[in-house]
Amino acid sequence: MATAAAAKEDVAHRFAKDQLKAIIERIERLEEEKKTISDDIRDVYAEAKGNGFDVKALRTIVRMRKQDANEREEQETILETYMQALGML
């Protein structure tokens, strides 16, 4: 009886070990893909800069396009209010 229980425990242990290894390998693969994508994005920004575009402005536009239209409008309104208060507009 103890041998059967030990065998089941060994199978469960092996399954958990294999599952953990698979998860870790997936994460490592995704991290490598993320690095590749980050490198590609950096190359695109470098290309844009080489063509005379302002990279800071491009990054701002990309960030703004990710926002919901209402959220972006609210942020722009607040920014404009602050700029007016400081005499910048």
From Swiss-Prot:
Pfam families on file: GapR_DNA-bd (PF10073)
Superkingdom of this protein's organism: Bacteria
Entry-linked InterPro entries: GapR-like, GapR-like_DNA-bd
GO MF annotations in UniProt: DNA binding
Family designation: Belongs to the UPF0335 family.
Protein name per UniProt: UPF0335 protein OCAR_5086/OCA5_c28780
Lineage of the organism: Bacteria, Pseudomonadati, Pseudomonadota, Alphaproteobacteria, Hyphomicrobiales
